[in-house]
């Protein structure tokens, strides 16, 4: 259980349809069932 704060906040997957946060090992969204998940961005995008 040596999980850093950064790992806990950033190691997630985000649904492309409803933007729900999902665990990293998820195959589909927990809210809407959509299969297209992306990993949460770990760096801010520049303008």
Swiss-Prot record:
Biological processes annotated in GO: translation
Transmembrane segments annotated in the record for this chain: none
GO molecular function, one term: structural constituent of ribosome
Superkingdom in the source lineage: Archaea
GO cellular component: ribonucleoprotein complex; ribosome
Stored PANTHER family: 50S RIBOSOMAL PROTEIN L40E, LARGE RIBOSOMAL SUBUNIT PROTEIN EL40
Protein name: Large ribosomal subunit protein eL40
Gene: rpl40e
């Amino acid at each position: 259980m040596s999980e850093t704060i950064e790992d806990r906040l950033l190691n997630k997957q985000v649904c492309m349809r409803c933007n729900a946060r999902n665990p990293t090992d998820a195959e589909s969204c927990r809210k809407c069932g959509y299969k297209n998940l992306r990993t949460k961005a770990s760096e801010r995008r520049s303008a």
